[in-house]
């Protein structure tokens, strides 16, 4: 079996990691071993935080809806309960956007929820 020289493949693999580490401070962008650790950690954080982002946005929407619904004399849970009973299928993202951009429209939706409680 002939000898395999892997210089090109190894260099390409290292350069790929160093390219991902571009912009990191100090040795983390220059030395392969430090760059590998930094890139692995960064990719792990990125994977985890793509999931956390969804939770954070949902919590933000709920906070905004709660603040707007309390201005209309309802708690968040009562508002959602009333909307479910009234078969209003507006998700929390849209409700939060309405609460911020169109308070008058949100108060109309809140009045629909109030009638169902």
Swiss-Prot record:
Matching InterPro entries: Ribosomal_bL20, RIBOSOMAL_L20_CS, Ribosomal_protein_bL20_C
Keyword terms, alphabetized: Ribonucleoprotein, Ribosomal protein, RNA-binding, rRNA-binding
Classification of source organism: Bacteria, Pseudomonadati, Thermodesulfobacteriota, Desulfuromonadia, Geobacterales
Protein's name according to its UniProt entry: Large ribosomal subunit protein bL20
Function: Binds directly to 23S ribosomal RNA and is necessary for the in vitro assembly process of the 50S ribosomal subunit. It is not involved in the protein synthesizing functions of that subunit.
Source species: Geobacter metallireducens (strain ATCC 53774 / DSM 7210 / GS-15)
GO molecular function: rRNA binding; structural constituent of ribosome
CDD domains: Ribosomal_L20
GO terms classed as biological process: ribosomal large subunit assembly; translation
